[in-house]
A protein has these predicted regions:
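Catalytic cores of alpha/beta
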Residues: 1-10, 22, 91-129, 143
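Short active-site-adjacent structural elements
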Residues: 83-85, 113-116, 135-138
Length: 150
């Protein structure tokens, strides 16, 4: 709540908040839509504790539940491909995007500008790119230009 009072628009609730009581508490304390729920998925299930502990939750179903509870957006990270320049799992992102009406930010596996475009076409409103930029696989300007044209 303190960050919102300072003028911060959104607060990301980390993957530890996969239990509904934790997210409900966070959502109840700040303005509607201000919580971005971070969902990390591995092997098709939401994971916590540094991606080591499965929860049994389907990412799309979890995203839909958090939307019902008042989350304003979802940051979806596919940790199967995170940081590996291995390419994206478009189907996983499409599943989460299709399950909710709130914005979805996609993360994990981006290796090429084409991956950025593909994620935009899933309906994701934003894409997190880390390793590809760090390793010089492409420039931010090139990714933005390609996404704008898509």
């Amino acid at each position: 709540r303190g960050l919102i009072d300072l003028g911060i628009d959104r607060v990301i609730s980390g993957p530890g908040a996969v239990e509904p009581p934790a997210i409900v508490a966070a959502i109840d304390e700040i303005p509607p839509g201000s919580v971005v729920v971070s969902l990390d998925a591995k092997g098709g299930e939401v994971v916590v504790s540094g991606w080591t502990e499965g929860t049994g939750l389907d990412p799309a179903a979890a995203a839909a539940r958090y939307e019902e509870l008042g989350a304003g957006a979802v940051l979806f990270t596919n940790v199967d491909v995170e940081g590996q320049l291995a390419g994206i799992d478009r189907n996983a992102v499409e599943s989460v995007v299709g399950a909710v009406d709130i914005p979805v930010i996609a993360s994990g596996g981006v290796a090429t500008v084409e991956d950025v475009v593909a994620l935009k076409r899933t309906g994701a409103v934003a894409v997190v790119v880390g390793t590809a930029l760090y390793e010089g696989a492409f420039t931010l300007r090139a990714a933005q230009a390609a996404a704008d044209e898509a």
